[in-house]
Every structure is written in structure tokens, then in C-alpha cells.
Amino acid sequence: MVMTDPIADLLTRVRNANSVRHEVVEVPSSSVKKAIVNILLQEGYLKGVEEYNDGVVPMMRLTLKYGANNERVITGLKRISKPGLRVYCKKDEVPRVLNGLGIALISTSKGLVVDREARKLGLGGEVICYVW
């Protein structure tokens, strides 16, 4: 089956696993998904990532992170730029998620970066998603 938006599929799998408090979620791997997952890991939204090859499709096993009383670290995930409606921002219009409590992932000429880094580097680009 052909997937029209693999990034939305990744975000939906993480959102669904998080909502039912699963410890682990498995997603098909790609270079863009690896970049997104690495940023989520660096920002403290995921506990761990393991890559493996399941024969046909390379996969990633994501370990979700929860707080002390089993509260969710990821409160929300929202896909912004979609295949049918791309959303771009200029360097002066980089979005701020929940007044800095969340992050916006932006695809720039320097690769995938977080909104803080895009502001610091003076870069605009395609707004991939919000995480809070």
C-alpha cells in the first residue's frame, strides 16, 4: 500500500501509542523520519530509539517517555505542512509553540531544525510539525 504522508503516519503512531500509554511503538524507517526521531530524542520527548531490519522494510522501535506518575511527556503532536497544503515560514516568522514550551520542527536548507535553532541561525523553511 502506498503511503501519501509518511511523516503524518509517524506522528499518528506515536500519538496513538502515547494516548494508551504503550511503552514501545514501531514505525517504518526513512531518512526524514530518522531526523524527526533524533530531534525528539534530543529534546527529551523520547526515551530511546532502536533501528532494525525486519527483512523487507527497515524499522525503528521508539521507546516513549513518561513522567514519575506515568504522566505523558508528549502532550500533543500536530502535523502542519501537509502534501496538499505546504506551509512555509520566513526567518522573521518562525512560529513559537505554546510560547516556547513546545517545539516546531522546520525543514531548512541546513536540514531539519527546531524553531529555536532556526531563529538563532536566521533560517526559514517548511514547518513540518508542532510537538508539545
From Swiss-Prot:
SUPFAM superfamilies (UniProt xref): Ribosomal protein S8 (SSF56047)
Keyword check for Ribosomal protein: yes
Highest taxon listed in the record's lineage: Bacteria
Single Gene Ontology MF annotation: structural constituent of ribosome
Family under the similarity heading: Belongs to the universal ribosomal protein uS8 family.
Subunit structure: Part of the 30S ribosomal subunit. Contacts proteins S5 and S12.
Function: One of the primary rRNA binding proteins, it binds directly to 16S rRNA central domain where it helps coordinate assembly of the platform of the 30S subunit.
Name of the protein: Small ribosomal subunit protein uS8
The encoding gene: rpsH
